[in-house]
Amino acid sequence: AKDIQSHPEPGFYEERTAAHVAAFLRGLGLRVHGGLARTGVRAEWMEQDGPNITIIGELDAIGCKSHPMADPVNGTAHACGHHAQIAAMIGAALALTNEEVQASLSGSVSFFAVPAEEYIDADKRAWLRKEGIGFPASGKSELIRLGEFDHSDIILTTHVHMMPVEEDFYLGNAACNGFSAERVTVRGKAAHAAIDPWDGVNALSITSSAIQMMGLMRETFREEDHVRLHNVIRKAGDVINAVPDEAVIETKVRAASLDAIRATQEKMDRAYDGAAYAFGGTIEREPLQGYMPILHRGADKVMEESVKLLDASYRCSKPADFNNACTDVGDLTHLFPVLNFTFGGFAGKLHGADFKIMDEELAYIKPAKLLALTTYRLLCDQAKEAKKICREFKPVFNKETYCQYIRDNFHENE
């Protein structure tokens, strides 16, 4: 964990981190596949008949130049605790790759270090498409497209606490927002800013008016939809003495369901269209794939039984729990049963310069134990508990319908 923390890398470019993880897993005698969605690493253990449990760790760091451990070149830092996830996944592999353990289990386990959980902005996406990434929004989405989860039956994920939690562990998946994004280009008309500004169409004024309209729309958002709107102006004219004829904005709509995301995106689009009409400009937009909302899942019995074996406090997810943030784990929850827990052991803010691991046992060791114990309980006794979870789970999408949804809504070209 400390080595990975000292060498942070951005999404889809985690080459050093991936090589480090692959070497460790090979050292355990596992069959390792690398270069998945550029940098993903998957190691297989047992490979026998029965359910597959896929344990996930995320490779990438977050852009945070102000963090004291930020890379001076790429500007990223492990201020979201992904290095702790990798440590937990590796620790679980150490515990499970034991002949005596294997003899008592049915099924298989995959240890999957995945790239690019953090949001990839529009400019980088264009480059990634040229590099052959079909769904460049996130690593998990691209890995679904590539079929790298085709053999998975149950997914185990973990993260540092993403909500205020006093206990050591939070078991289950709290519902989370999903989001969609757009790259909006506002076309106006250039004119001299002093001599004849009335002959111009100010693209920045169109943008400002649209954003003000969105502010006035907030009373139309239902509380249960947890809507959040974001606009970042990437460009607003070229010179100070000319009416801006072009503005470029990257937008994001967060909400708690796919329907709410779609409805709110339409409102945002109408704001830009209406402002452009009022000033005599035009709008061009490029829909960008986001993340799907996380579907709530309570604490599974196997996980709660496992955490009781640790010297740790915990609480279980409740249907009313909600996290306004987004993660591409949401996409997985629409296809697979995802058993999740979060953990403490850190201080400071997620994605902040003050994020710091304070309790290494709680942040690195105990999560590894909980992953291993949960996996063991899923696959022991002829994998009875794993089979029950798979039998009861009702997916929203399969791989084909998921990929078609992305193509239909976000124009992602493969």
Regions found by a protein language model. Give the residues of each.
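Non-cysteine beta-strand/loop elements that form the S-adenosyl-L-methionine
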Residues: T54-I56, K65, E182-R187, L339-G344
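Metal-dependent amide/peptide-bond hydrolase catalytic core
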Residues: S205-E414
